[in-house]
C-alpha cells in the first residue's frame, strides 16, 4: 500500500546520498555552463505531483484515454501561456526535449534526403542542425553556413549557398554564438528561394521572452525551444508558430504525436506552465537584462586580461573563450576550473585544430550565476579568478586559493536561499 510518509531517505539511502551530494555540489560550485540554470521550487513541485501518474496520449479535448479532464486544463494553461509569452498563434508543449521538438519539425516539413541549410556545429550550431553524427545529418542533405573572420554570421555566404543549393528548409539558431541573429534577413533569404525558415531559439528563449533579444516568432515559419536554459523551467521542449497556417499546425502536432512520441509527460508540462507564468512576470525581464549585463561584464575582464572572445564580445548570455595559441586546451581549462568549483564546458572554436573531445575553447554563460543574484561586480571578480587559473592552470596553489574564494562567494549567494 502507498502511504504519504514514504520517502527516499529511509528506503534508498544510496540514491538519497547521491541526491544530497548533487544538491551540495550545486550550492558550492559556480555554474557557468551556458545551457544550465536553476528552476524554481514551484516548477519542481509541479514535477513531483500526482500528474506523473496520468497517461494522456493525444491533445486537449482529443485524448485516447479517459480521465483527462484535469490534465487537459494543465496542458491548455501551458499552451496559452507559451503563445502569450512569445506572440505565437500555435504552441505544442509536448516535446520531451529540444532535440525531439527539432526532430518533429524535420518530420513535419521534410522528406529524407531533402536539402537543409544549417549553422556549422564548429561555428556555433547545434547537433540537430545537421551534424553528421546526428539524425539530421544522417537523414538529410546538409549544407552548412558559418561565421566570417569577425566572428559574425556571414549572411552573404548564407544567401549564396541558399541560391546555389536551394534547400527546402533553412535553420537559424545556435548553441555557441554570442551575437544577435538577423531573423528578418534570414526570412528574406528563405523567401527568395521558397524555403521554410525554422528557428531553434533554445539558448536565448528567456532573453526573447523578456524582450532583450530579437523575437524570431514573427519571422520564422516554425520556432522551437527548450524550456530550461535561459527560460529556467523544467527540462523539455516546445514548438511555436505565428504562421496562421492550420495545415502546418496539424503537420507539427502529428509529427510530435503519434509521429515521434507517445504519451506526454504531464508533470513536466505542468512545470512548463508554471515556468511560462513566471516568465510573464515583470521581475523576469529584470533577471534577463541582468543576464546580459553580467555576460558583458565578464567579456570586459577577459579582454582586459588578454583573452580572445569569439566575435569580440557578446550580445546575449554566453561567450566563447578562444585558447588557440595558448599552451592550454579546452579540456585542460575545463578540468582546472572544475578543480576550483567553477563549472564550464570545453567547446570547439572556429577553425579549431583540436578534436571535439579536446577543443581549443571554453563556453561560458551567465543564466545560473544571475539566478543566484550575481551582478556585474561579482561577475567581474569571478572572471578575474578564472583568468588567474587559465594563466597558471598547473599551479595547485592558485586553484586552491580560487576554490576558497568560490566557496565564500557561493555562501553569500545561495541557490535556494
From Swiss-Prot:
Top-level EC class as recorded in UniProt: transferase
Site (Plays an important role in substrate specificity): 228
Residues given in the record as (6S)-5,6,7,8-tetrahydrofolate binding sites: 121, 125-127, 355-357
Reactions listed under catalytic activity: (6R)-5,10-methylene-5,6,7,8-tetrahydrofolate + glycine + H2O = (6S)-5,6,7,8-tetrahydrofolate + L-serine
Pathway entry: One-carbon metabolism; tetrahydrofolate interconversion; Amino-acid biosynthesis; glycine biosynthesis; glycine from L-serine: step 1/1
Cofactor: pyridoxal 5'-phosphate
Modification sites for N6-(pyridoxal phosphate)lysine: 229
Role of this protein: Catalyzes the reversible interconversion of serine and glycine with tetrahydrofolate (THF) serving as the one-carbon carrier. This reaction serves as the major source of one-carbon groups required for the biosynthesis of purines, thymidylate, methionine, and other important biomolecules. Also exhibits THF-independent aldolase activity toward beta-hydroxyamino acids, producing glycine and aldehydes, via a retro-aldol mechanism.
Family note: Belongs to the SHMT family.
Name recorded for this polypeptide: Serine hydroxymethyltransferase
Amino acid at each position: 500500500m502507498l502511504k504519504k510518509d514514504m520517502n527516499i531517505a529511509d528506503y534508498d539511502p544510496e540514491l538519497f546520498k547521491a541526491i544530497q551530494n548533487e544538491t551540495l555540489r550545486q550550492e558550492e560550485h559556480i555554474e557557468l555552463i551556458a545551457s544550465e540554470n536553476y528552476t524554481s521550487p514551484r516548477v519542481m513541485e509541479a514535477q513531483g505531483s500526482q500528474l506523473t501518474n496520468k497517461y494522456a496520449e493525444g491533445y486537449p479535448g482529443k485524448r485516447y484515454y479517459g480521465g483527462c479532464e484535469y490534465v487537459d486544463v494543465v496542458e491548455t494553461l501551458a499552451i496559452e501561456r507559451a503563445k502569450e509569452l512569445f506572440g505565437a498563434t500555435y504552441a505544442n508543449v509536448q516535446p520531451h526535449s529540444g532535440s525531439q521538438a527539432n526532430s518533429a519539425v524535420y518530420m513535419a516539413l521534410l522528406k529524407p534526403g531533402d536539402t537543409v541549410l544549417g549553422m556549422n556545429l564548429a561555428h556555433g550550431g547545434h547537433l540537430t542542425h545537421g551534424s553528421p553524427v546526428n539524425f539530421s545529418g544522417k537523414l538529410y542533405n546538409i549544407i552548412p553556413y558559418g561565421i566570417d573572420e569577425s566572428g559574425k554570421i556571414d549572411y552573404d555566404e548564407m544567401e549564396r549557398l541558399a541560391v546555389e543549393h536551394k534547400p527546402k528548409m533553412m535553420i537559424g539558431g545556435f548553441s555557441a554564438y554570442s551575437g544577435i541573429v538577423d531573423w528578418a534577413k534570414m526570412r528574406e533569404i528563405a523567401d527568395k528561394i521558397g524555403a521554410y525558415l525554422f528557428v531553434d531559439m533554445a539558448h536565448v528563449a528567456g532573453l526573447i521572452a523578456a524582450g532583450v533579444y530579437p523575437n524570431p516568432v514573427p519571422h520564422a515559419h516554425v520556432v522551437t525551444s527548450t524550456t530550461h536554459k535561459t527560460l529556467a523551467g523544467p527540462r523539455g521542449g516546445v514548438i511555436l508558430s505565428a504562421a496562421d497556417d492550420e495545415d502546418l499546425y496539424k503537420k507539427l502536432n502529428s509529427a510530435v504525436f503519434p509521429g515521434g512520441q507517445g504519451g506526454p509527460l504531464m508533470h513536466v508540462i505542468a512545470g512548463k506552465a508554471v515556468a511560462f507564468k513566471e516568465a510573464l512576470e515583470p521581475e523576469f525581464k529584470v533577471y534577463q537584462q541582468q543576464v546580459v549585463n553580467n555576460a558583458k561584464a565578464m567579456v570586459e575582464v577577459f579582454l582586459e586580461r588578454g583573452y580572445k572572445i569569439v566575435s569580440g564580445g557578446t550580445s546575449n548570455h554566453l561567450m566563447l573563450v578562444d585558447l588557440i595559441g595558448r599552451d592550454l586546451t579546452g579540456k585542460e581549462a575545463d578540468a582546472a576550473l572544475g578543480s576550483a568549483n567553477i563549472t564550464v564546458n570545453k567547446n570547439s572554436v572556429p577553425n579549431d585544430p583540436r578534436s571535439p573531445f579536446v577543443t581549443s575553447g571554453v563556453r561560458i554563460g551567465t543564466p545560473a550565476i544571475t539566478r543566484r543574484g550575481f551582478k556585474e561586480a561579482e561577475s567581474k571578480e569571478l572572471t578575474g579568478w578564472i583568468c588567474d587559473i587559465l594563466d597558471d592552470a598547473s599551479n595547485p596553489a592558485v586553484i586552491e586559493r580560487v576554490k576558497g574564494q568560490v566557496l565564500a562567494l557561493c555562501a553569500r549567494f545561495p541557490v535556494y536561499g
